[in-house]
Structure formats: structure tokens, C-alpha cells
Amino acid sequence: MLRSTLSRSAWRTGRHQAARNASRAFSATAQRPAEVELTIDGKKVSIEAGSALIQACEKAGVTIPRYCYHEKLMIAGNCRMCLVEVEKVPKPVASCAWPVQPGMVVKTNSPLTHKAREGVMEFLLANHPLDCPICDQGGECDLQDQSMRYGGDRGRFHEVGGKRAVEDKNMGPLIKTSMNRCIQCTRCVRFANDIAGAPELGSTGRGNDLQIGTYLEKNLDSELSGNVIDLCPVGALTSKPYAFRARPWELKKTESIDVLDGLGSNIRVDTRGLEVMRILPRLNDEVNEEWINDKTRFACDGLKTQRLTIPLVRREGKFEPASWDQALTEIAHAYQTLNPQGNEFKAIAGQLTEVESLVAMKDLANRLGSENLALDMPSGHKPLAHGVDVRSNYIFNSSIVGIESADVILLVGTNPRHEAAVLNARIRKQWLRSDLEIGVVGQTWDSTFEFEHLGTDHAALQKALEGDFGKKLQSAKNPMIIVGSGVTDHGDANAFYETVGKFVDSNASNFLTEEWNGYNVLQRAASRVGAFEVGFTVPSAEIAQTKPKFVWLLGADEFNEADIPKDAFIVYQGHHGDRGAQIADIVLPGAAYTEKAGTYVNTEGRVQMTRAATGLPGAARTDWKILRAVSEYLGVRLPYDDVAQLRDRMVEISPALSSYDIIEPPSLQQLSKVQLVEQNQGATATNEPLKKVIENFYFTDAISRSSPTMARCSAAKKTGDPRTNFMAPGMEEDRPMGQIAYGA
């Protein structure tokens, strides 16, 4: 839902200037700001003018208690827990809302400060229920921690009617509410309105009657809604799927990355035994800040349903369990019987495949004489229109954080709200705080920012670039064109890339400079950039059209089934019994991203790694080890025996893969022009409209399609009713894989 123009303009008024300056998330300036010197607890501190006093205290190494203040949110000043004493000021001041001033003398631990905080804590606890033994926030609750220091041993609040009681709200299948615990810090409201763009969440009433909720019972319509759980400093908002399942001290914590979209959000995987209990975000300001999308957070229950745990061999139309030796022997026998020549062996890689497995699969295919490699796409396996030899052709060149410097953005064939929800929040942030203008070529969607719709086909793109919006891009200091998967999967892809490439090349003075590259490709799948890095692509249309006799599906579930001949022998290697496994002759159980250490490259070219948080279920094996074993049975033994040797092979193919958490800048931008323009010269367009590549945000991969929680979200989104049951009649499309209706 769009914010009103009045709401957007309020960000630019003087009334909100201090709050904007006080939030580190919204500070961006080309010049070094003036410094202010002040004294905090006898220590001299220098900090940027306009910073909040609480930030100066943090710089001095002093931890200030707070509930409403958060570095990424606008200032509210609700809780008053951050009170400090300032000399020559008659009363304690809220350090989150008080800007620093030259020569200030601040005392953060004086008797006056301590007494003031004790008073605030007493008011907060006056109506707070004693739910700690049954509250999911127990053990990681800010109110618990701070009450140990500032709470009294008894309360003075007595009322005949008892403590305030507030009815719990139903916000959908993800967020569990216990509104008696709410301390009205409004973190959730500010996040929903300012970051997520979901103004349904707000406050009603005032004083003792103030309540947080959606007013009308409805879902919190945002792909980022789960972040309010992390923001809530008490147990008012907790995870509904995680309710009463574990305590934080019982969990093993593993730092990893998300692979359910192309962003590579940094996450922490909490496990107990072999089960992933929950997934939380990790701070990385260059990628996901502190946010993750709901699919990343809640689809983890899909890791334990529909899992492949033993090899399966299809006999007489039915799968039968087999040992690894039996399954690999069957594969070798089928290969010898069919005797595929060269490119008649085809390998298709899925969206969640890590670089190690891609390299092993590529080397195996090459040793068998085949170059017929493909990525699973519903549109088929033709070569990418824009070529993949130069990094700037397939990555987000401006970088994710570069969005916060853009002044004009053109979105072509992409819906960032579904393809990269956290990146979409960056666009919204820049739109709110600046005069950012956004144009869209493609199908529209329920956006969190205002945009100018320029059309849906190639002709509309040409008209836009030749018209007023093209002039805006030409005159912008930091223009951005973001090309999405809707273009790559479209029949007019060649024409789209030629048109965009010509425009970028003719305006290189502001699109391609030493400081800025405004051409960006938004990859929606975690494996895409890594596949292009190691050359896991079909080199020509002729090879792609070769009829295969033997097909290897490496975690591939999004393929076009018409591209696979009915008489081909199919091996599916993956971790879920999804679409690929259903058509396979042999199924080999692999590892999910939480069960292996694997290399992924995100949409901006940043190399990152998952880490094994749990062991492998049943007889499942790490994917590259499976391919290594297969190579011996096929008589083309791969030359690496451990993962270190395999990663040396990766770096041999692409040296950029040796630098983790670093974006290697493209060194041959002019060659990019050759591939974008000259390779597509004279491409004709059918002017078919661009289509949405993601119809259902909650069912985009094998893990999320197996998740009961994602099924509940899909059903609730479809009906608009948070109480919808996905097993009810009429909800067949919104069920997880393998589920049947009542009574069936």
C-alpha cells in the first residue's frame, strides 16, 4: 500500500530533521560533517553534529538502557528509559531524542539518573503480567535484563480493577500476540510504516487505553512482517510457529546465509539436535542491514518435511529404496545402455545449488564430452541473451547499498517486493528520504513506493528511454536501471538487452564512471551468479536444442518439463521430493543449505558461505561428494578428493571466488558493451508483455513449497483472513507438497 504524498513530505520538514539526523540508518552526505565535542562521565567524546546523545554515549563505551530507540528506526522517545543527567538542565533528558551540543557535560550513572530510570521501570512493570515462565521471550528479553538492575523488589501500584488487560490480536499465521505484555514502545509500528510499507499496523486510543494492532482483524500484509518479532523488546510479539518449542540456552547457534532468494541475507541458524528450530537475521549493513524476509525466517519447517533420506530407484513405475551402491550401479548401467554421445548428456542445476556442486557437475559433464549445461527456468534452457563472460553483465553493479545514492531508478521486468524483499525496503528507504523518481516497465504490483508505470513490453521500454523518463535518467547524477528475471525469461530478451545496452553506452558519462555503474541485473535465485562465474551455462542455441538421452537434475525443480524428452533417463539429486523427484528414474538424497558448508555468490557479486548447522538426515550425502562418487562409477574420476581441492578448482576457473565477503569490481566494462549491444544487434521483438516471474511469494522453491507455515501464509494471503486453513476445501493450490484434503 502506498504512503500518501503528505506522509512522504513530512520526512523533509524541519519537524523531523533532528530525528533524521539522529538515525544512523538515514545519514548520507558527501562532505564530512562538523564534529561536536562533549564530556560523558568525565570522558571527552567527539561526534558528528546532529547525532543523538545516546549515540555519543555508545561511542564513549557507555551502554544506555532503551526500549523504543533503535538505530534503524525513526526516533519516538516513548519509553523514557534512556534518561541521562545533563549539567545545567533541570531534569533528566531522553538521550535518544536529545541532539548533542558543544560542551555538554553528561552523567549516565548519577544517583539522579538511576532514580529516574527506576521510576520509569516501575511504571513499565505496573501493568506487566508475570508471564516470564511461559513467555517465549524469556532468556532474551530486554525487560527482564533491565529490571534486574532498575526494578524494585516490590510494587506500589494497587488498583481495585487489577492490572490492565488487553485482548490479543490475530495478525496472521506468523506473529503471535500477547498484548498484555506490550509496553507501547511502537518499534513495530515504526518498522511496519517506515521500513516495510505496511501501514495496517498502528496504535489506537491514548493513555492507559492505548493499544497496538491492525484495528480490523487482518494479516499484516508485508513480506518483512517477521522482523517485528526481533524488534519487540518484550514478549508482546513472538513467533507463532516457534511458540513453546525451545529456550534460547538450549539452542546451538550457527552463522550462515540465506539462499531462498538472490540477496544472500546474513542469518543465524538456531538448532537442537538435527532440527532447525528458528532462523534469525545477522547484522550486515551492506547486504540486509538487520532484516530478513518472512520466507527466510519461517520456511525452515520445510527442511523436515518431504525430505529425501535414502536413494530411490524406480521399478515398474514405483520408487523402491536402495543402497548407494545399488543406485550408483543402476546409473552406470543406464549410461552404458543408452550410450549418450557428447551433448546428449544434459545437466540442469537448480536455484539452491552451491558453487562447489556446480563445478563438480560441470567437470563431470565435460569429462563425459558434454557442454549441455542449463539452469532451471520455466522459459527453457536457451543461452542467456546478454552473455555471461563479463561480471558486469549479470550482477547488481551499483551494489545493494548503492540504492541509497540513486536519484532515478528504472525497473525493467522485475517485482523487487517478491524477488528481493529486503532490497525493496532499500528502495523504499531512499524514496522516502529523497526526491527519488521510479519508473516501471512490466506488470505492476502492490508496491511500497510510488512509481510511474511506463508500459509492459519492449516498445514501451523504447518509448520510455526516448521520452521524458529517459531524459530524467540522462540528467541524473546516479541513475540506475534494474533488469529483472522477467526479462531473462522472456522471448524478447535479446531486444530488451540491446535497447538497455545502447542507452547505457550512449549515456556512459553518468552511467559508467569510476565511482558508479548504473546497469544492474537483479538475480532472483541464489545459484545464478555463481553459475555464471564458473561458466555453468550452455554456450550456444544449437547445443541447447540437442535432444538429451540422459538428464541429470541437480536440485532442479523449476524446469520446463517439455524440454525433457519422455524417453530420457532422469537422475534427480536433491534434498526434497519436489517436482524433479516426481519425474526421475533414480533419486539421490543430497544436503540442504543448513546441512553443508557451501559457497554462494549473491546478486551483487559478493562471495559468501553457508555453514553446516545440523547433520545430514538418513543416508543423505553432500552433493559434490555424490558427484565425485558417480564419476568413479562412470569411469571418469574427478580429480579432487576433498573440499579444499575442489575449492582450488573453483578459484582456478574464477579467481573472484577466493575473496569472501568482498565484491570484486568488474575490470572490463567496455567488453560488457560488446555483449549487451553487438551480440544482440538487430534483435526483433514480438512486443509480448513482460510477465510476473513469481506468482506466489511463499512457494518459490522446494523448501518453501514443503513448508506448512508457508502454506498457511499463502492461504491467508489469498483470502485476506488470518484464520484461513490451507487444508480446507478450495485451497488445493495453497497446500505444501504432498498434502491432501480432509477425507481424501
Curated annotation (Swiss-Prot):
Residue stretch of the organelle transit peptide: 1-33
Amino acids binding [4Fe-4S] cluster 1:
H128, C132, C135, C141
Q: Where in the cell is it found?
A: Mitochondrion inner membrane
In terms of one coarse class, where is the protein primarily found? mitochondrion
From start to end residue, where is composition biased (Polar residues)? 1-10
Listed binding positions for [2Fe-2S] cluster are: C68, C79, C82, C96
Where along the chain is [4Fe-4S] cluster 2 bound? C182, C185, C188, C232
Identify the domain of life. Eukaryota
Locate the 4Fe-4S His(Cys)3-ligated-type domain: which residues?
Answer: 112-151
Keywords (A to Z) from UniProt: 2Fe-2S, 4Fe-4S, Electron transport, Iron, Iron-sulfur, Membrane, Metal-binding, Mitochondrion, Mitochondrion inner membrane, NAD, Oxidoreductase, Respiratory chain, Transit peptide, Translocase, Transport, Ubiquinone
- Name assigned to this protein: NADH-ubiquinone oxidoreductase 78 kDa subunit, mitochondrial
